[in-house]
């Protein structure tokens, strides 16, 4: 199944390639940020800092 894109083929292909590149960059950015946040949380847990959301209602003043 071969489609003829007409005289705008280069524009269409370039647009799809640019969109794919942007999506790939965003996925990479999110993956890098996730690893960074996970590492920071692990370091905080190791240092003894606890999360406020982990406390029960009875622990609050």
UniProtKB/Swiss-Prot annotation:
One of its GO terms (cellular component) is plasma membrane. The keyword Ligase does not apply. It is found in: Cell inner membrane. The keyword Cell membrane applies. It is a single-pass membrane protein. InterPro entries: Haem_export_protD_CcmD. The chain crosses the membrane at residues 11-31. Its main location: membrane. Disulfide bonds: none annotated. Signal peptide: none annotated. Keywords: Cell inner membrane, Cell membrane, Cytochrome c-type biogenesis, Membrane, Transmembrane, Transmembrane helix, Transport. One of its GO terms (biological process) is cytochrome complex assembly. Belongs to the CcmD/CycX/HelD family. NCBIfam families: cytochro_ccmD. Required for the export of heme to the periplasm for the biogenesis of c-type cytochromes. This is Heme exporter protein D. It comes from Bradyrhizobium diazoefficiens (strain JCM 10833 / BCRC 13528 / IAM 13628 / NBRC 14792 / USDA 110). The lineage of its organism: Bacteria, Pseudomonadati, Pseudomonadota, Alphaproteobacteria, Hyphomicrobiales. The gene is cycX.
């Amino acid at each position: 199944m071969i489609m003829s894109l007409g005289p705008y083929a280069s524009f269409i292909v370039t647009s799809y390639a640019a969109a794919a590149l942007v999506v790939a960059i965003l996925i990479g950015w999110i993956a890098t940020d996730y690893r960074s946040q996970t590492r920071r949380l692990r370091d905080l847990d190791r240092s003894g800092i606890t999360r406020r959301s982990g406390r029960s209602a009875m622990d609050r003043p």
